[in-house]
């Protein structure tokens, strides 16, 4: 018979932390103990930051990014190129592209990729809003920045079919050898994609 070693409040904290990606029950217990030990330095500021996030952060009605203003700072930045829309699966992908300064265009967050096995269909994504944006005369290119997975490629093909009537160029990210990568460590699919998408040097 298991013996309760913590009160219900602490158990609730552990249960909630265990719902975070990458945290199982054991890691959640360690995180909870760390927060409790660092109450003034970490737990109180974290609770405050979470409350601010609850009160102020919202989803951009234009692109699906999260921000403290709506439309978001990316959509309202006059230095951005309004003719380019970069399509990503989720906000984490948008942030990755921004960290890399990979584009000066604007974004569209689908919310996920099509995944029949997980029960994610077209109605679960913001594809209709993307198609509507693609028909804006100011938009000239849609860049599909989706993962090179089966679900990512399925989504890319589905979106491309829906954009055939829009007067836009549809491109996707190149797939292949990563910077600093060694050929011997790459899988066959990556090597094949890199060979097909080779460029002049």
Curated annotation (Swiss-Prot):
Residues in C4-type zinc fingers: 60-75
Matching CDD domains: TOPRIM_recR
Gene Ontology biological process terms from the UniProt entry: DNA recombination; DNA repair
Signal peptide: none
NCBIfam families: recR
Stated role: May play a role in DNA repair. It seems to be involved in an RecBC-independent recombinational process of DNA repair. It may act with RecF and RecO.
Record family assignment: Belongs to the RecR family.
Descriptive protein name: Recombination protein RecR
